[in-house]
Amino acid sequence: MSRKKTPKSKAGSAPATSALPAANGPRPVRPGTARPGPEAPPNGPPQPGRSSVGGGGDFYDVAFKVMLVGDSGVGKTCLLVRFKDGAFLAGTFISTVGIDFRNKVVDVDGMKVKLQIWDTAGQERFRSVTHAYYRDAHALLLLYDVTNKASFDSIQAWLTEIQEHAQDDVVLMLLGNKVDSAQERAVKREDAEKLAKDYGLPFMETSAKTGLNVDLAFTAIAKELKQRHTKAPSEPRFQLHDYIKREGRGASCCRP
């Protein structure tokens, strides 16, 4: 298989619409198959005020688009920087404006998998920008802040948006971030596990500050996408739920 070279990063925006939750309760969201194919091309120029950092000269076999979504302040940018650079953005909170992305190539069972990870703004005024990027996303990491009950209460609204704008077979995972702030916890783990079970989502708690389960979340997504892309008859089917339950610290498998 010939390998491609990672291009420089770009980002952009386009408008779309929103939707309200269904009155008859949650519709299960099945962790599914990402549509195989080449990486999604950027939709426009970089947003002003933030730099887009690419993968430089890294080579890869296949690329997938992954989006980080959730309310503003839940730690999406910090989670991305922890995974990409192994660092923590301490200090003053700076909210993402519009959308930005970074690339990272990971080795999955001998295959070079490039994850093009899009960091989205959580504020309502940027929501239409986010909608435009759902349609060609292969996977979504939906975050809430365990110290912020309102961010958890917004999860069902985010799931409705995902159902409206994303592919039916998008891979979806729920992450409770900032678990390092145990004394400030406002969302019980049991409540998040119940929500994840209702929607059939894999779930784990993470910390961008300590790195808890951060690599695991992205690695699990990469393994799922790679396995669905190759579809080798002799290769056992990758079980996303079982993998994070086995490998994670404090992770759980939540099936309906």
From Swiss-Prot:
Its cofactor is Mg(2+). A lipid is attached at C253, C254 (S-geranylgeranyl cysteine). GTP binds at residues 72-78, 95-96, 122, 177-178, 180, 208-209. PANTHER family: LD44762P (PTHR47980). Residues 38-48 have a biased composition (Pro residues). It catalyses: GTP + H2O = GDP + phosphate + H(+). Its main location: membrane. GO terms for cellular component: Golgi cisterna; Golgi membrane; plasma membrane; secretory granule membrane; synaptic vesicle membrane; trans-Golgi network. Pfam families: Ras. Regulated by guanine nucleotide exchange factors (GEFs) which promote the exchange of bound GDP for free GTP. Regulated by GTPase activating proteins (GAPs) which increase the GTP hydrolysis activity. Inhibited by GDP dissociation inhibitors (GDIs). It is an enzyme of class 3 (hydrolase). The small GTPases Rab are key regulators of intracellular membrane trafficking, from the formation of transport vesicles to their fusion with membranes. Rabs cycle between an inactive GDP-bound form and an active GTP-bound form that is able to recruit to membranes different set of downstream effectors directly responsible for vesicle formation, movement, tethering and fusion. RAB26 mediates transport of ADRA2A and ADRA2B from the Golgi to the cell membrane. Plays a role in the maturation of zymogenic granules and in pepsinogen secretion in the stomach. It is found in: Cell membrane. A motif (Switch 2) lies at residues 119-136. Belongs to the small GTPase superfamily. Rab family. GO terms for molecular function: GMP binding; GTP binding; GTPase activity. Switch 1, switch 2 and the interswitch regions are characteristic of Rab GTPases and mediate the interactions with Rab downstream effectors. The switch regions undergo conformational changes upon nucleotide binding which drive interaction with specific sets of effector proteins, with most effectors only binding to GTP-bound Rab. This is Ras-related protein Rab-26. Mg(2+) binds at T77, T96, D119. GO terms for biological process: exocrine system development; Golgi to plasma membrane protein transport; regulated exocytosis; regulation of exocytosis; regulation protein catabolic process at presynapse; vesicle-mediated transport. A motif (Switch 1) lies at residues 86-101. The gene is RAB26. Residues 1-53 are annotated as: Disordered. Keywords: Cell membrane, GTP-binding, Hydrolase, Lipoprotein, Magnesium, Membrane, Metal-binding, Nucleotide-binding, Prenylation, Protein transport, Transport.
